[in-house]
Regions:
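Phosphopantetheine-dependent thiolation modules in NRPS/PKS and related acyl-activating systems
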Residues: 2-36, 40, 44, 50-80
């Protein structure tokens, strides 16, 4: 799976998980632009963990603001 494939899958999972109608880009801010509550973010992260078969450490997610930063984190975790 290429980096571009991973990024597309992340956006697909987020769109499905949050049922957002926004056009998501790497610059979309998860809280500010999408208006997600902390509970919605937890559900979204669970869906991403399931989709990629990974665990996203809470300590790592604290500094993530945008979908692009989330993509970078997931790609980093996938590379091990």
């Amino acid at each position: 799976m290429t980096t571009q494939d991973v990024k597309k899958k992340i956006i697909d999972v987020i769109e499905e998980s949050t049922e957002t109608e926004l056009e998501l880009t790497p610059d979309t801010e998860i809280f500010a632009d999408m208006g997600l509550s902390s509970v919605e973010v937890v559900v979204m992260l669970g869906d991403l963990e399931d989709a990629f078969g990974i665990d996203i450490p809470a300590a790592d997610i604290r500094n993530v603001r945008t979908i692009g930063e989330l993509s970078d984190l997931i790609i980093f975790i996938l590379k091990g």
